Amino acid sequence: MITNKRNIAISILTADCAPILIIEKKQKFVGAIHAGWKGAFKGIVKKTIQLLKKNGCSEKDMIACIGPCIKKNSYEVKNDFFKLFKDKNKKNVNFFTFKKKKIFFDLTKYIKSQFYENGVKKIDIIRKDTFSLENNFFSSRRSKKNKHNDYGRNISAIMIK
């Protein structure tokens, strides 16, 4: 979702997925993206950049912030997940770590690479793990692991003053 309207906040809710906030200062646009692995895999970053460009924005004037989300040391995945990414592009193996017969996915690094591939070089990353920081963030995976029926959501918002 993007907007150039002043004094209207746009926001997204996440619970392990990556919240991404974007600003393009010259054309005065902001964007908010909810990027889980599926959305990232299907190109939500590229689609949002294209939408901003369609509205006169330039990649070189965009600044993105990838907010708190599940980090690679907490994001264990199955082999079929790894294979899905590897089959799409062999370079995707760079977003996985293998430890003690377990596979871990680096969602933040994957999203960052998509910004770079699409010309956005100014990227801030909040290096907070929603899964491991139990007192600070809600986490879908942590709630499921602890057998809770539901979980809270973290909100990320952006606005042009």
Language-model regions, residue ranges each:
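Active-site microenvironment for binding and transforming phosphate-containing groups
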Residues: 1-161
